[in-house]
Amino acid sequence: MGLTIAQKIIKEHLVSGEMIPGEEIALKIDQTLTQDATGTMAYLEFETMGVPRVKTELSVAYIDHNTLQSGFENADDHRFIQSMAKKYGLYFSRPGNGICHQVHLERFGKPGKTLIGSDSHTPTGGGIGMLAMGAGGLDVAVAMGGGAYYITMPKMYKVNLTGKLQDFVTAKDVSLEILRILSVKGGVGAIIEWGGEGVKTLSVPERATITNMGTELGATTSIFPSDEITRAFLEAQGRGEDYIELKSDDDAAYDRVIDINLSELKPLIACPHSPDNVVTVESLKGTKVDQVCIGSCTNSSLYDMLKAAALLKGKTVAPSVSLSVSPGSKQVLSMLADCGALTDIIASGARLLECACGPCIGMGFSPNSGGVSLRTFNRNFEGRSGTADGQVYLVSPETAVAAALTGEITDPRLLGEMPQVKMPDKFKIDDSAVIPPADAETAKTLEILRGPNIKPFPDSIPQGDTLRAELVLKVGDNITTDHIMPAGAKILPYRSNIPYLSRFCFGVCDETFPERAKAAGQSIIVGGNNYGQGSSREHAALVPLYLGVRAVVAKSFARIHAANLINAGIMPLTFKNPDDYDSLSQSDMLSIKNVYEGMDSGNLVLTDEKTGKDIQLVCSFTDRQKAILKAGGLLKYVGQGGGL
């Protein structure tokens, strides 16, 4: 039987395990990336391991999240990360150089390579045929130290594309269509491979938009073939030597095949507050709009920006709308300036923001109270924009421009003729904002720069054979890592200070949680389906760990968050009968006996001491995961000789 594209890369990088869906496999990692909101903790963890130099082919530290620098905290963290990069062998992308995924696609990504990043949208690299996955910072630290990356061997889904996108219908609409079909949990446990004749009609930036938003499906990653379109992109970036052809075998087998005719798609929009709440744009026509944002790692390429600029040229943003534009990289911004497109954007009345994540993570440009904001981003979770009651819709750049010009949700096909955008044969190459590391000898003499906001990694406790703890919080379905550990301008500066950060844990759900959890000493959280979806931020595990959470019992878990819980020494356990969720109440005292035996058998019994009811739980921990939990987390496991 033939192999899929992903299976070929996995086979080439397989360290241990068998390529059977559901089995644990270990992969050699070629490249890593971090961003500053998760990077500080990842480098503290790496430093603790005592490895003198990163052992990957390439590791890059990006600064793209905490760029406001309204106090000393962000600037200190950036100095810390830069000093770590210089000493330990990483490249450092300076603030203003761009969003990690956009810059990595332009300057570093290579077809056929493995990449993990401490950001959930790392699968952007699948647009050029990388096996690129989001991971927790500790997993990234282990990979930098030469350790393997462990995942459950995924199933293989194929999306077969036919036809060609019509004018004003975009790759973003393809992303929203697959979300409409599969939902935010429909890709869990799978790799989404994109194929068919329609693939040949999509540029690398369009492909990267699609793989970027594959994260919202809960998929392990998404990937496109590496073909002549990939070659042309790499050659235009001056990296033609990085090209290799990658395609699936004709007899490759897939667990599910989905057909999408690109020619039949219409402009789509995701309504508040979930990326899979998808309807047609025309069905919402006339809805008043307060704000429009164009940018993010999903839609900030030169291709997207040129299209937006062409539609804005000679026009003026509606008086009732505030429009922001955030180019994805310094390369994009510079080329917009050179060709005059930047002038067209500014002349329309748009506000030009820094080449960074910005509004996508609530880092400025929050909408007004109850405001309707159309964004070319990938997530519209409640409160993520920085405005608790903000109504955020996800759209393509074309739909965003249509709303900015008319002041209401408008089908972009009503704008008239679509201006033709031609991509350059050569991109403008200037890597001066990427600082290389010191040589190994010089590095030995370098000092790490630490500010007072950087606090140690929280200590974890080895999992004992009996757990007795209060149920301190009960939450529902699709709880995101934004719910667990919010972001935004007020909170992100403290990502390297877990004690202070803990004050905001679950603040969206229950402001009393931090104090109640600390008072309980040790505790259990109960959740519904798809617990921990969204961002890869390990802080959503580290902060509960700091507050004494010992286990999370849910109907189901998102992949990255479940791994982060285990890495922190917290047990993710699943209801055998999901209906048992209803029988538990917040503040009940719960107990689990014979934990080690239950880990081995995959079956545990949780007793509600208030009602006397026994509830069956299940788990599927590998031997390695059991050892991590018994050690008190991955960092302690590595310290005891495991993992590297």
Q: Where do the language-model regions lie?
A:
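Fe-S-dependent hydro-lyases/dehydratases of central metabolism
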Residues: 1-644
